[in-house]
């Protein structure tokens, strides 16, 4: 069965965010329905970082990018959400 691989780029809503705590909150909100395969930090500047979230889901109407974005938008410390990349993959 094919799967969908997503990469989301999220930016914090404030400068003094605890990135390790934010990563745990993101994983806690998305999983188990949306398994997080990794979260990378990307330096933006002046100590501010973006987080790149890697998610792989089954290809199904039950799993949507709209739902992922809705979940992420409800996290207090997230100020911006961008679907940076997605593709269909087969294993």
Swiss-Prot record:
Pfam families: EF1_GNE. InterPro entries: eEF-1beta-like_sf, EF1B_bsu/dsu_GNE, Transl_elong_EF1B/ribsomal_bS6, Transl_elong_EF1B_B_arc. The keyword Signal does not apply. One of its GO terms (molecular function) is translation elongation factor activity. SMART domains: EF1_GNE. HAMAP family: EF1_beta (MF_00043). Belongs to the EF-1-beta/EF-1-delta family. This is Elongation factor 1-beta.
